[in-house]
Amino acid sequence: YWVKNVPAYQLVFLTNGKGDDYDKLQISIENRNLLFSKERMVYVESMVLFEKGKETWWYGMEERYIESLQLSFKDEKYLKKQLCLCTMIDMGEIGCFNRNQLENILNEIKDEYQIVGTPRGIIVGRGYEGENFQRIMEIQIPIALKH
């Protein structure tokens, strides 16, 4: 585990899911045109918010880049800058991901830290190692120290 200040993000909604089961993508035409235009290249993170009983998937972009590129998304969600406890998890093969690893982490840290926001994950890598397809996610849990 490590602790870091995670910058502010703007999020563009993609879909709901539970584990590796996802609903249909729901990105608006306006947001799709901004993100995937021929005039600019926009770098976004594939981000998930671990809400009660479900996951919501988003494209996330640091606030500073949105300001620099003068982008304006429709119906975006804002995540403020936060102190987060972070770790990496292996999401496994496609079809194997569930939130059990997150629940284990939350149980492990509950005596030391107060969770002050919605835990989230960012897919930081995916690819094959030998014959196994791996997806690596950075887990970010907004925290405050318990007194």
Residue ranges and their predicted role:
Residues 1-147:
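A solvent-exposed interaction/effector surface
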